[in-house]
């Protein structure tokens, strides 16, 4: 059946033939078929993007580990961490680094996927533009034929054919509106993917290194404190200066981490559609 319809379409050349009902059925059908395929591709990308967001990384596990580590930093600053055993601190340090590396790997994979989607959207947007142009040409051709239809006495079959043509043109106008709408949606999805890529790049370049430094500073402070324990006044002053320097650095990085952490939250807001994109 498909080959038969394709043969008829090739025979008619996709053009209107006055009085031929098959030509009306096939008029603009190629552009509508292309539009339908593009729509399916956009839907597939959106569904896949949602699936990746839900399954590429264990968000709850990552967030829980980071929050636990940040709670430990707060506890350390208030001197509540001194009672913890060294092994427990080391385990927490290792767990935090493992979690950070897991997030880093997952975000890199997501970034590659988003870049691939961006290229796909470029092709889809171009194809939608072509569909819109083809549909516009069909509409113009049909409208011209309607304007030049015979006047005076006509048989019922002729009137019915032009009535079908008018309805067909109306359908093509709807398809053209859909092509325009899909193109806008594809542009928005492409832009949202670019925004998310930028946020991921910032997290990989700034946020994750800061979290690693936070963990290292805590362990370094522990090593320095134990290394200078029980020394003379000069040693005490050295450890005091080192302690003050590390605490200042820890406080500075902690505040910066909180600021940059907001950007991580924006990724989830964008993915969940909680933000509007220009």
Language-model-detected regions and their locations in the chain:
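Long, non-membrane, amphipathic alpha-helices that form coiled-coils
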Residues: 99-107, 128, 135, 165, ...
């Amino acid at each position: 059946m498909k080959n038969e319809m394709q043969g008829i379409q090739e025979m008619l050349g996709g053009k209107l033939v006055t009085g031929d009902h098959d030509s009306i059925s096939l008029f603009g059908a190629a552009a509508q078929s292309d539009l339908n395929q593009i729509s399916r591709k956009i839907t597939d990308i959106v569904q896949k993007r949602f699936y990746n967001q839900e399954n590429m990384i264990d968000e709850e596990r990552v967030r829980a580990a980071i929050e636990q580590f940040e709670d430990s930093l707060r506890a350390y600053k208030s001197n509540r961490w001194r009672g913890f055993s060294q092994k427990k601190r080391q385990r927490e340090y290792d767990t935090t680094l493992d979690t950070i590396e897991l997030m880093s790997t997952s975000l890199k994979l997501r970034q590659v996927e988003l870049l691939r989607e961006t290229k796909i959207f470029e092709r889809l947007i171009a194809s939608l533009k072509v569909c819109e142009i083809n549909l516009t040409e069909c509409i113009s051709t049909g409208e011209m034929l309607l304007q030049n239809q015979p006047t005076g006495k006509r048989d019922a079959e002729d009137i019915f054919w032009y009535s079908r043509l008018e309805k067909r043109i109306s359908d093509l106008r709807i398809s053209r509106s859909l092509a325009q709408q899909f193109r806008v949606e594809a542009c928005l999805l492409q832009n949202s993917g670019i925004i998310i890529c930028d946020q991921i790049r910032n997290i990989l370049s700034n946020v994750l290194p800061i979290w690693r430094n936070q963990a290292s500073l805590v362990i370094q402070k522990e090593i320095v404190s134990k290394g200078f324990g029980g020394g003379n006044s000069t040693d005490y002053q050295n450890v005091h200066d080192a302690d003050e320097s590390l605490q200042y650095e820890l406080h500075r990085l902690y505040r910066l981490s909180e600021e940059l952490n907001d950007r991580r939250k924006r990724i989830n807001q964008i993915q969940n559609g909680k933000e509007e994109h220009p």
